[in-house]
Amino acid sequence: MKTKTDFLKMKEQGEPITMLTAYDYPSAKLAEEAKVDMILVGDSLGMVVLGYDSTVPVTVEDMIHHTKAVRRGAKETFIVTDMPFMSYHVSLQDTMINARRIVQESGAHALKVEGAGEVISTIHYLTNAGIPVVAHLGLTPQSVGVLGGYKVQGKDAESAKKLIEDAKKCEEAGAIALVLECVPMQLAELISEQLTIPTIGIGAGQKVDGQVLVYHDLISYGVNRVPKFVKQYTSVQEEIVRGISQYVTEVKTGQFPEEKHSFTMKEEECLALYGGKQ
């Protein structure tokens, strides 16, 4: 399994880091078989798995439950788990309780937190307690209401400079990596050059140290729309609907199950069942 040290070496050597979300045993198993470097159990599960309109309703218990399943499916892959909404915007003591629960109960190797400001001290606090932390700047979905929607961040010089400052503070606080979401590629490149920790982009262009996508977006599974930054490498959704539709048709028309899908009794036992055996 790759570790923090391996990811730092990958950045130094210019080897791109691959990260993919996974939320359950089968998706994690497939991600590991595909040799993904790092798995993110994102609170995006609220939208793509649980059907919520945002990530806000996701709880600590949800993250623990799904991360445990991912750990069972990907035992040899580094796993990062999101701390959900309001689980770390509380007292440091309560933040530690939530963080400890996720790490101890789920087996996550690192936690991810969004934003800067007061979150910087949280990164420092968790790091000092021995919990690796991945920072997340740019578009931070948990704060989408404050940001005014799902918009590109850092498009003007002033806000871009603020993101650069925040990125440096995250590194100084002890973050082992930084996710940059929906920021101009020029800004992402500049931040990546100024940090020693890896940057993982999602909608941040090529000049970052790695990329992350949502599992369901990448394979077109259960999604109707995807953001501009997503490339869909396959479409399992069409095949799944086709297969289920065929199943429904065959049951309705009596084509399924066939004899080869059924079990039988010996003839004498069948006779005995119907009273034909003395």
UniProtKB/Swiss-Prot annotation:
Binding site for 3-methyl-2-oxobutanoate: D43, S44, D82, K112
Pathway the protein contributes to: Cofactor biosynthesis; (R)-pantothenate biosynthesis; (R)-pantoate from 3-methyl-2-oxobutanoate: step 1/2
Binding positions for Mg(2+) per the UniProt entry: D43, D82, E114
TM region(s), chain numbering: none
InterPro entries, sorted: Pantoate_hydroxy_MeTrfase, Pyrv/PenolPyrv_kinase-like_dom, Pyrv_kinase-like_dom_sf
Oligomeric and partner information: Homodecamer; pentamer of dimers.
Cofactor binding note from Swiss-Prot or TrEMBL: Binds 1 Mg(2+) ion per subunit.
First-listed, main subcellular location of the protein, grouped into a coarse class: cytoplasm
UniProt lineage: Bacteria, Bacillati, Bacillota, Bacilli, Bacillales
Protein name: 3-methyl-2-oxobutanoate hydroxymethyltransferase
EC assignment: 2.1.2.11
GO CC terms in record: cytoplasm
Cofactor: Mg(2+)
Active-site residues per Swiss-Prot or TrEMBL entry: E181
Entry's Gene Ontology BP terms: pantothenate biosynthetic process
Keywords: Cytoplasm, Magnesium, Metal-binding, Pantothenate biosynthesis, Transferase
Entry keyword Metal-binding: yes
Lineage: superkingdom: Bacteria
HAMAP family to which the protein is assigned, alphabetical: PanB
Organism per entry: Bacillus mycoides (strain KBAB4)
Pfam families per the UniProt record, alphabetical: Pantoate_transf (PF02548)
